[in-house]
Regions:
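Switch/communication elements of ASCE P-loop NTPase nucleotide-binding domains
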Residues: 1-30, 212-349
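P-loop NTPase switch/coupling surface
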Residues: 1-157, 194, 198, 385-402
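Non-catalytic, well-ordered alpha-helical scaffold segments
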Residues: 8, 112-115, 142, 237-240, ...
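A short mid-domain helix/strand-loop element embedded in enzyme catalytic domains
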Residues: 38-48, 209-212, 261-268
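A short, compositionally biased
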Residues: 51-60, 208-212, 312-314
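Extended helical coiled-coil dimerization/tether regions that scaffold
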Residues: 64, 143-264
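Acidic, Mg2+-coordinating catalytic modules of nucleic-acid enzymes
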Residues: 109, 284, 325, 329-402
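Short coil/turn segments at secondary-structure boundaries
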Residues: 130-131, 206, 353-357
Length: 402
């Protein structure tokens, strides 16, 4: 959808709906509907417009649980001063309450879904002041802390890396094995780095001395390099920190999976503008990479990039226009970017002044004014140089004159 079509609002609504289950968990917080979300309606009274927010604001959701049980729930904000209701979310809350009881009993068969929302401000963010180590209270629901804040909370993640790295060194001193959950998270990050850089020998570790994540790799000259992740470009940082945040949350939520935690944990991840900071070559593969690194996760993303849209099938695409969800009008997978721009995003791939000359050419052809058509086409050829569409227009003009 275009700017203002409602992509971010849709993702935030899904986040509010999903976070409802957190009301049943110790230490996790549900999101609420903001009064600013109310639709504004203007009434003409006298010489002025009287603008009034429209209530109630309601979010309705339907989900499939464990591939078989379908549930439905609603959250509502009835007035500007009211609170977001949970009374119509009984089905979801019963499931969450059952999860909480199983957590209290130490049930290792319980698989907690990873749930997170990443907004456009997700770049390697140190926005929260977390001076105390929340992992002192070692509970699996720590994996939900700040998961709906819209950013990868680097302070929380670094606390976890420090704790697990210390445990790794203690294991080594005592003759024990590695920490499989930590290695699984590093492996996910290494896969991500290798895929977007073309490297095949990257190694990611937590540096206790600098309290940074370091990445080691072999450069173009065969020299082994080691630099802090924080010194990489925005594109690398945003993508790798996203993968790291998802992976470490999985490890906290489901430590019983050990080294297979990223492969076995399911869940839903929301990403606003998944193409943010990414080179077009990365945009083409970002969804494929994410779904291969986390094969049991459902990703719901928004994008303006045709390179992202043509990397997925038509049935996986929703087009938003005027707050309405529409199916893609054509197959998207493998289509060229210009075709996606025209048919899906309703964007002209050429500047308006150039498009006007194209229109003038075809208008001249319709009027059989071939001299005018030739003049317009020659001007376009001078401006654009070698262009397949211009070559086709030249052939058409020659055929018309036979």
């Amino acid at each position: 959808g275009a700017k203002g079509a409602g992509k971010t609002s849709l993702l935030e609504s899904i986040a509010i709906a999903m976070s409802t289950m957190f009301t049943a968990f110790d230490g996790a917080k549900a999101m609420n509907i903001n009064k600013e979300s109310a639709h504004l309606k203007a009434y003409r009274i006298g010489s002025t417009d009287n603008v009034q927010p429209q209530y109630p604001v309601r979010i309705s959701a339907r989900a499939e649980i464990d591939g078989k049980q379908e549930i439905y729930w609603e959250r509502t904000l009835n007035t500007a001063k009211g609170k977001t209701t949970i009374k119509d979310a009984r089905q979801l809350l019963e499931i969450a309450e059952n999860y909480q009881k199983r957590l209290q009993k130490g049930d290792t068969t319980l698989v907690l879904p990873v749930i997170a929302y990443y907004g456009t401000g997700r770049l390697w963010d140190y926005h929260r002041e977390k001076q105390t180590d929340i992992f002192e209270k070692n509970t699996r629901t720590n994996g939900y802390i700040d998961c709906m804040s819209g950013t990868a909370n680097i302070k929380l993640m670094m606390n976890w890396f420090l704790k697990m790295t210390v445990q790794k060194y203690q294991n080594q001193e005592n003759g024990y094995g590695p920490v499989p959950e930590l290695e699984a998270v590093f492996s996910a990050m290494e896969q991500c780095y290798n895929r977007i850089t073309g490297s095949n020998d990257s190694k990611i570790q937590y540096n206790i001395g600098t309290k940074e994540i370091d990445v080691a790799y072999t450069d173009l000259y065969g020299v082994r390099m080691r630099i802090p992740l924080n010194q990489l470009s925005d594109g690398y940082k945003s993508t790798i920190s996203l993968v790291a945040d998802i992976a470490y949350r999985m490890a906290v939520l489901n430590p019983q999976f050990l080294g297979e935690v990223c492969l076995k944990t399911d869940g839903i991840i929301l990403i606003d503008e998944v193409d943010l900071h990414l080179h077009p070559a990365w945009q083409k593969r970002i969804l494929k990479d994410l779904t291969e690194i986390f094969p049991n996760v459902q990703f719901v993303v928004s994008t303006h990039a045709p390179e992202v849209i043509n990397s997925v099938l038509r049935e996986q695409v929703i087009v938003l226009e005027n707050y309405q969800a529409l199916p893609a009008p054509m197959e998207t997978y493998g289509k060229d970017a210009n075709g996606i721009l025209r048919a899906i995003m309703r964007v002209k791939e050429r500047p308006n002044d150039i498009m006007e000359q194209f229109d003038a050419f075809y208008h001249a052809i319709d009027l059989h004014d071939y001299m005018q058509a030739d003049e317009i086409l020659s001007n376009l050829e001078e401006l654009l140089g070698d262009d397949p569409e211009l070559a086709a227009m030249r052939v058409q003009l020659e055929l018309e004159q036979i």
